Amino acid sequence: MKVKVGINGYGTIGKRVAYAVSKQDDMELIGVTKTKPDFEAYLARERGIPVYAASEEFLPRFEKAGFEVAGTLSDLLENVDVIVDATPGGMGAKNKALYEKAGVKAIFQGGEKAEVAQVSFVAQANYEKALGKDYVRVVSCNTTGLTRTLSALQEYIDYVYAVMIRRAADPNDSKRGPVNAITPSVTVPSHHGPDVQTVIPINIETMAFVVPTTLMHVHSVMIELKKPITREDVIDIFENTTRVLLFEKERGFESTAQLIEFARDLHREWNNLYEIAVWKESISVKGNRLFYIQAVHQESDVVPENVDAIRAMFEMADKWESIRKTNKSLGILK
């Protein structure tokens, strides 16, 4: 029997999760919500996805445009087993009462505080902790990226120091910035380090900057080691870590631009690069310190985590069975 899934919020993350759910043989996409009849709503309808108004207050917008919706969020909740909340940060916590009243399990995104859910989730790091849970939070794109590589190295970690170089806005966002500035997060740690600690128990400090680009985030990671490891060991670990790929500058991957072009060349939906990209040349061990640089596609790296979270919550598969199914369905390279 397939798990019935609804998506509350059909934007950058919501539409990608909807696509991913539609590719699973053990899930059924029941519908998505929108606050207005914009081009995304029309495209969803053309793709055969039932569109619901996010609440009754938004119905006049659809009526004015002659856009017939399948109902409201309340109607959607009556027909699903789980709702993926992909609304803007902070809205998920407000929506939780609706999900509780409807008796529906819910997945929240990283824009929500950890307290909104019973567990913060990255599949390869703590899948088992989400088994049977009613409320799970998939952590943010940056936290997911850090957790993927750090969890693979966890036994070697004494202390992590990481700098987040964050994109200013998503490609479709014409309202955010900066356009001609670099904006530091002046408090230390930035929120990313404490967020990683909601998934894996490590010592970590983070700093962050926002720069004028839309393509990806970049992380500069330095780890103080508690036991020896060689560069070759790290390369071997990353080569055998799911959803992490090594890229080489000498093969043309000089920047995030080429990484996104790689995703385009793979004919990925929306240029999705689900995998965390680590520059192989950046991996360096100096004494008891390990260094590497990685890039995170902020629009898509959390998408497979949402799919795996559904399976964990309904105990549909064990960790590696779920990861394998999700990876295969989305064309994730390893």
Curated annotation (Swiss-Prot):
Binding-site residues, NAD(+): T12, I13, G111, R167, Q298
Pathway where this protein functions: Carbohydrate degradation; glycolysis; pyruvate from D-glyceraldehyde 3-phosphate: step 1/5
Active site: C141
Chief location: cytoplasm
GO cellular component, one term: cytoplasm
Keyword NAD: yes
GO biological process, one term: glycolytic process
Superkingdom classification of source: Archaea
Binding residues for D-glyceraldehyde 3-phosphate: S140, C141, N142, H192, G193
Top enzyme category: oxidoreductase
SMART domains named in the record: Gp_dh_N
Keywords noted in UniProt: Cytoplasm, Glycolysis, NAD, NADP, Oxidoreductase
NCBIfam families on file: GAPDH-II_archae, PRK04207.1
Subunit comment: Homotetramer.
The protein's name: Glyceraldehyde-3-phosphate dehydrogenase
Biological source species: Thermococcus kodakarensis (strain ATCC BAA-918 / JCM 12380 / KOD1)
Lineage: Archaea, Methanobacteriati, Methanobacteriota, Thermococci, Thermococcales
Gene (UniProt): gap
